[in-house]
Each structure stands twice: as C-alpha cells, then as structure tokens.
Amino acid sequence: GLLGSIGNAIGAFIANKLKP
C-alpha cells in the first residue's frame, strides 16, 4: 500500500545516505 511505499522510499534514502 501507500504506507509501505513510503517506508520503502525512506529506507532506500537512509541506505543511500549510510552507504553512498
């Protein structure tokens, strides 16, 4: 759902910040 999509987007954003 929408909430899951937002969670995935945030997770990817954090992952990119931690491991560019």
Swiss-Prot record:
Provide the tissue specificity: Expressed by the skin dorsal glands.
Record keywords, A-Z = Amphibian defense peptide, Secreted
Q: Which GO terms describe its molecular function?
A: nitric-oxide synthase regulator activity
A Gene Ontology biological process in which this protein takes part is: defense response
Write the protein's name. Dahlein-5.1
Subcellular location, record wording:
Secreted
Which GO cellular component terms are attached? Answer: extracellular region
Function field: Has no antimicrobial activity. Strongly inhibits the formation of NO by neuronal nitric oxide synthase at micromolar concentrations. Acts by a non-competitive mechanism, probably by binding to calcium/calmodulin and as a consequence blocking calmodulin attachment to nNOS.
> Looking at the keywords, is Secreted present?
yes
Kindly list the organism's lineage: Eukaryota, Metazoa, Chordata, Craniata, Vertebrata
